[in-house]
């Protein structure tokens, strides 16, 4: 009986061995008949779907935005699109990187960069708006100045040590413009945000500045007991200063308790100004592979814009309106064509918003009012930038009125 069992076990073993061997042979034969993708083909496919976006430091709102875009848009199939965020230096360098670096397709830059570069070197940047164009406005970058409690206004910073963020960062570029406009001279330092906050708490610094979309992660870590607050920047807080130029070049903005519960008391706001962060791209020839890749990205990004209205995404996505126009900039052709082809499709992250800043009807009504008011009052016509600022204030007024009406119901 034991011999029979041994024979059976041996037969089973031989059968399994034969099956495994035949299966392995069949698999090898199938692979031989249909070889895998070659190294060169895989390399070509990988490059054909990749687009790069240069951003500032990792704590910048632009980095979080680009990460969100990557997470929503990425499709690693051979015919898909892949977004590669690149950490750059920020400031004017991001725009220079898009303009001059051959491996950079797009970048997140601030609206005033175009004007500032043309002012610095009119010859080099003479036609920059034809070489780098905007895809869409992303969010507002608030000018945030955090100070010790013994500092009450910008004038109190004269001669004191103020951190302008890293050298040539967007914060330094804009802070330089604003402090020069105010005629306030300070002792500058260029620490990163985390180090600057520690030096501010210790009393070594009187203030630190960050220009980015609020809430900013470094400021969000500040505690009430740290003895710090934000400085207001408006005509009421600086009555002896002429803020006309600042109002013409920057948007009115405010920091709220909801953004910074430990820094802004409930029921109050801190007025300031803001720049607009734009997604821009290099204008490759329309028949080139790189232009076609950016056009594919635009289609994927714009088509999925509603997916960014999610609690898992940065709250600043609520400000995005793909159709918003930027004075002084030229719209990237692929983006303009997409918007023209999707006029009836929602182009905001929150399509249920009733106050659409780029609504053609609302904007046209505002422009008609300005023309009639200007001709009847005899006042000097406003510049495009001044009209944009006034329109932003008009939209804010409408928004507040809508809230009051809802509360009264």
Q: Residues of each region from the PLM?
A:
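Extracytoplasmic
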Residues: 46-50, 78-80, 90-93, 101-103, ...
